[in-house]
């Protein structure tokens, strides 16, 4: 099991990239609330560690060349955010399934993956887009799926 901070980091990365891709090429303010969830500061004005890590995940994405932005909005987000060329190409690339939930064949075997033979080639290709695999991983709620897709994006070179 991965450390919870790493799992949160991967989820923050996935959500941020998904939001930015959906708005590409528009530049807009991306708030930590959208990435890490709504959080109210405590009586000292400090946010939760999860919220803070969401903010620093956005900064990390910029430092590593996946996004660009004009400025930070306190510790609440980044202004004029947009995907970089590198991130856009990685997210719009076609990839064999990065992670697929196995389906149950019978009680003894859990080996068969979701079939694709009855789908049209265009639907299969659309499902193979990295961004769509990431969206499916986020919808599934599976930390393992999100982690695998984000690692594929971060570690795979063009």
Give the residues covered by each predicted segment:
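A short, conserved structural fragment
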Residues: 59-75
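Short, cationic, amphipathic peptide segments
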Residues: 106-158
């Amino acid at each position: 099991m991965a450390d919870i901070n790493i799992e949160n980091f991967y989820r923050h990365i996935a959500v941020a990239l998904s939001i930015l891709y959906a708005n590409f090429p528009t530049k807009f303010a991306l708030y930590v609330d959208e990435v890490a969830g709504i959080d109210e500061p405590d009586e000292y004005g400090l946010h939760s560690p999860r919220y803070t890590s969401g903010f620093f995940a956005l900064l990390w994405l910029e430092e590593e060349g996946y996004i660009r932005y004009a400025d930070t909005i306190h510790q609440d987000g980044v202004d004029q955010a947009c995907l970089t060329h590198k991130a856009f190409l990685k997210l719009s690339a076609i990839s064999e399934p990065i992670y697929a939930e196995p389906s149950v064949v019978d009680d003894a075997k859990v080996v068969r993956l979701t079939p694709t033979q009855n789908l049209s080639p265009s639907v299969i290709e659309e499902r193979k887009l990295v961004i769509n695999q990431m969206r499916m991983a986020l919808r599934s709620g599976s930390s393992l799926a999100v982690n695998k897709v984000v690692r594929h994006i971060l570690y795979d070179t063009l």
